Design a protein with these regions (language model features):
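Active-site acidic carboxylates
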Residues: 1-75, 90-91, 95-96, 154
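A short glycine-rich beta-strand->turn/loop micro-motif centered on a GG-aromatic cluster
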Residues: 102-105, 124-138
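Active-site neighborhoods of divalent-metal-dependent phosphate/nucleic-acid chemistry enzymes
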Residues: 98, 104-109
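A short, structured active-site edge motif that brings together acidic residues
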Residues: 73-83, 131-132
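Histidine-anchored nucleotide/phosphate-binding helix
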Residues: 32-39, 110-121
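Structural recognition of alpha->loop->beta junctions
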Residues: 68-76, 136-157
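Short phosphate-binding/catalytic loops that engage adenosine nucleotides
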Residues: 98, 124-125, 153
Length: 157
């Protein structure tokens, strides 16, 4: 099964009250484009990932960004850059017989990039949809992209 992993599309990275210097993404465009991609997948194959650092455990749960189409209950939390650090996500992917994963979200240099690497290491075919991945530092992303391509990540747009 082919799945769409929507990574870190949450209020603190893309919402109106975010630190824009730290998270300079074109939020509205990215949300709109990802919503269009979500429409291409059956509900059960859409998986949302939220990032919650260990020091945030006592706080409110992370909220997906307003405006993002949330059409499945497949929401997994992670505490490390790679979404594959969540064992429940790995179990879910095995249960639904996932073999190909399209990654979208933020940031291409960090969590989406780390998830792409771990996805390859976990024997998944990884599609990195560059037009649907927010990147804060494009100069760094040139190096990140080369590394990912070398590992076998397939870039699409």
């Amino acid at each position: 099964m082919k799945c769409l992993l929507v990574i870190d599309m949450q209020e603190d990275y893309l919402g109106n009250s975010r630190d824009v210097k730290r998270y300079p993404y074109k939020s509205k465009e990215l949300i709109h484009s990802i919503n269009n991609k979500i429409l291409e997948y059956p509900n059960e194959s859409i998986i949302y990932i939220v990032n919650r650092f260990f020091w945030e455990i006592g706080r409110k749960p992370k909220k997906l960004v307003d405006g993002l189409s949330v059409i499945s209950n497949n929401v997994f939390e992670k505490r490390m850059p790679s979404c594959f650090s969540n064992k429940k996500l790995l179990e879910h992917l095995q249960k639904i017989d996932a073999s190909e994963l399209e990654l979208v979200g933020v940031d291409g240099n960090y969590c989406v990039g780390a998830s792409a690497i771990d996805g390859i290491n976990n024997q998944y075919k990884i599609l990195f949809n560059a037009s649907l991945v927010g990147v804060g530092d494009y100069n760094k992303f040139i190096r990140t992209k080369k590394k990912l391509e070398k590992m076998g990540v397939v870039f699409t747009s």
